[in-house]
C-alpha cells in the first residue's frame, strides 16, 4: 500500500491531515492497475510521531490487511528508521526505488492533496 499524508502543517491552531492509502499492482517500471483507494481525515491539535503512527494504523485497519508492505516517502515518519517503523506497525515499510513505486506514491499524494483541498474549500463555503 502506498501512503501519503497531506496537511502536516499547523493552520488555525489545528493539524488538518488527510491520509491516502492506495493499493496497486505494481511492476518496476509502471503501475499495472489500482486495486483500491481509501482516505482518512483527522483534525488534531498535535502532530507527534505517536499521532502519525496511530493514525496510519487506523488507515491500515480501514483499508484491510491485504497488502505486503507500506510504501512511503522517507519523511512521512519524521525520518525515523524504516526498521523501527516497520516493527511498530507490524508491516514492512519501504521507500521508493523504482519508477513504479514512485508512481504509486504520486497517486497517493494526488489523492490526499486533492481531498484535503476540496474539504478546505467546503469548510470555507459553510
Curated annotation (Swiss-Prot):
Pfam families in the cross-refs: DUF2209 (PF09974)
Taxonomic path: Archaea, Methanobacteriati, Methanobacteriota, Methanomada group, Methanococci
InterPro entries registered for this protein in UniProt: UCP021940 (IPR014514)
Protein name: Uncharacterized protein MJ0095
Organism: Methanocaldococcus jannaschii (strain ATCC 43067 / DSM 2661 / JAL-1 / JCM 10045 / NBRC 100440)
Amino acid at each position: 500500500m502506498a501512503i501519503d499524508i497531506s496537511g502536516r502543517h499547523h493552520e488555525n491552531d489545528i493539524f488538518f491531515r488527510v491520509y491516502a492509502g492506495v493499493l496497486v499492482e505494481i511492476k518496476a517500471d509502471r503501475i499495472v492497475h489500482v486495486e483500491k483507494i481509501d482516505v482518512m481525515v483527522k483534525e488534531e491539535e498535535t502532530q507527534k510521531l505517536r499521532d502519525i503512527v496511530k493514525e496510519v494504523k487506523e488507515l491500515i485497519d480501514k483499508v484491510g490487511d491485504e497488502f505486503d508492505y507500506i510504501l512511503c516517502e522517507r519523511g512521512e515518519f519524521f525520518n525515523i528508521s524504516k526498521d523501527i517503523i516497520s516493527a511498530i506497525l507490524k508491516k514492512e515499510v519501504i521507500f521508493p526505488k523504482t519508477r513504479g513505486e514512485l508512481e504509486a506514491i504520486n497517486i497517493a499524494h494526488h489523492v490526499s492533496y486533492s481531498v484535503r483541498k476540496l474539504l478546505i474549500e467546503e469548510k470555507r463555503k459553510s
